[in-house]
Amino acid sequence: MNYLTLIAAASLLTAGTESKKDGYPVKEGDCAFPCGYDNAYCDKLCKERKADSGYCYWGNILCYCYGLPDKAAIKGYGRCRPGKK
């Protein structure tokens, strides 16, 4: 019976919470946002998408966000296809 009470309490505490993820935000066609080494631009872009913060990842010269909502679209493994939704 104690296990049932513990599980019920844990379920109530986690109800309504959102998980967060990190990644490259994307626009149409699974295309990431180029940043040209501008950290301020990426931080603003990420916060507009409800992330905690963001920066310009120098290896790819693309914006990378920390703490995006779980429903936010991030870059997958496919190619960028401009013009496709």
Swiss-Prot record:
GO molecular function annotations of the record:
sodium channel inhibitor activity; toxin activity
| Domain called LCN-type CS-alpha/beta: residue spans | 21-81
Q: Which SUPFAM superfamilies match?
A: Scorpion toxin-like
Signal peptide positions (record): 1-19
Sorted alphabetically, the Gene Ontology cellular component annotations on this record are: extracellular region
Q: Where in or outside the cell?
A: Secreted
Going by the UniProt record, its keywords in alphabetical order are: Amidation, Disulfide bond, Ion channel impairing toxin, Neurotoxin, Secreted, Signal, Toxin, Voltage-gated sodium channel impairing toxin
- From what superkingdom does this record's organism come? Eukaryota
Where does the record place the modification Proline amide? P82
Q: List the disulfide bonds.
A: C31-C80, C35-C56, C42-C63, C46-C65
Where it mainly occurs, coarsely classed, is secreted
Question: What is known about the tissue distribution of this protein?
Answer: Expressed by the venom gland.
Q: Which GO terms describe its biological process?
A: defense response
The entry's free-text remark on domains says: Has the structural arrangement of an alpha-helix connected to antiparallel beta-sheets by disulfide bonds (CS-alpha/beta).
Q: Family, per the entry?
A: Belongs to the long (4 C-C) scorpion toxin superfamily. Sodium channel inhibitor family. Alpha subfamily.
According to its UniProt entry, the function of this protein is described as: Alpha toxins bind voltage-independently at site-3 of sodium channels (Nav) and inhibit the inactivation of the activated channels, thereby blocking neuronal transmission.
Please identify the protein, giving its name as recorded.
Toxin TdNa8
Q: Which organism is it from?
A: Tityus discrepans (Venezuelan scorpion)
